[in-house]
């Protein structure tokens, strides 16, 4: 069964593309028709592409991989923040930091700087600074939080990127391409799908459109996370089973030995009484 259906996408306005004069010819395979100068996206292809992307994303989540969600446009940023956070994934909704992927060690240093400032606040070091120094550090911390706060748990390069509006986020896409990181993307009729590994043809300008696509993707990822959790519990149970069996055998052996010792003691006492009676 598909994760989204035609009517659901239609209601969310996923089919609305851009003006014909703004189209990218590479999107032709995903365009159904033109109406009043606007390209209409083939929603049956969108359904198929959502299912394909969702399955891959589910497997990534099941394997414990991290997917970085990227959306800095106003209509999408809050939806992406909420959906990504719901499955414990990092996201970028403010300006894309140049070199975020290609210069990842530098980004990690900036994140560690945030942790250092937090530590200063906790251990009292911050209180010993001058008023001016406190103000500078506080502003620096706020700036870092705004751009990097949502990726503090990203300790290594992500296994994939999910991008809303691949044209706007072309720098992120280019960095991922350079490093061979797979890119999932909502691609509108004005964008180039050629550098996107998993194309989801869809209206990337409407909040409802982003909501329905992200909802399906994150639902699949949540399933993957739940399956991973269940497998971990089963593995732990399987590991504990032999231990429990060994404990049970040891308890039986101990009980048997105790019984044998008791029987021997009783026999010894009985023999002594018999000898005394003689």
Curated annotation (Swiss-Prot):
Residues 235-278 are annotated as: Disordered. InterPro entries: Ribosomal_uS2, Ribosomal_uS2_bac/mit/plastid, Ribosomal_uS2_CS, Ribosomal_uS2_flav_dom_sf. GO terms for cellular component: cytosolic small ribosomal subunit. The keyword Transferase does not apply. Signal peptide: none annotated. Transmembrane segments: none annotated. Coiled coil: none annotated. One of its GO terms (molecular function) is structural constituent of ribosome. Residues 252-261 have a biased composition (Basic and acidic residues). Belongs to the universal ribosomal protein uS2 family. This is Small ribosomal subunit protein uS2. The lineage of its organism: Bacteria, Pseudomonadati, Bacteroidota, Bacteroidia, Bacteroidales.
């Amino acid at each position: 069964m598909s994760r989204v259906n035609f009517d659901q996408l239609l209601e969310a306005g996923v089919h609305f593309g851009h003006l014909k004069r703004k189209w990218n010819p590479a999107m032709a395979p995903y365009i159904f028709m033109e109406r009043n100068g606007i390209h209409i996206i083939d929603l049956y292809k969108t359904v198929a592409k959502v299912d394909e992307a969702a399955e891959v994303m589910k497997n990534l989540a099941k394997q414990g991989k991290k997917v970085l969600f990227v959306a800095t446009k106003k209509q999408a940023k809050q939806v992406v923040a909420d959906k990504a956070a719901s499955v414990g994934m990092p996201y970028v909704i403010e300006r894309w930091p140049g070199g975020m992927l290609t210069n990842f060690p530098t980004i990690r240093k900036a994140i560690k700087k945030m942790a250092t400032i937090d530590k200063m606040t906790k251990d009292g070091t911050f209180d010993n600074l001058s008023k001016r120094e406190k103000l500078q550090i506080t502003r620096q911390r706020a700036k870092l939080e705004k751009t990097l706060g949502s990726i503090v748990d990203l300790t290594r390069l992500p296994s994939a990127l999910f991008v809303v509006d691949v044209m706007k986020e072309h720098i992120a896409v280019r960095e991922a391409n350079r490093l061979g990181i797979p890119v999932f993307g909502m691609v509108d009729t004005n964008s180039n799908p050629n550098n996107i590994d998993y194309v989801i043809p869809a209206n990337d300008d409407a909040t409802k459109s982003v909501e329905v696509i992200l909802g399906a993707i994150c639902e699949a990822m949540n399933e993957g996370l739940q399956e991973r959790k269940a497998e971990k519990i089963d593995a732990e149970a399987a590991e504990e089973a032999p231990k429990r069996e060994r404990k049970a055998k040891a308890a039986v052996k101990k009980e048997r030995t105790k019984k044998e010792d008791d029987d021997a003691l009783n026999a010894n006492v009985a023999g002594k009484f018999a000898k005394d009676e003689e």
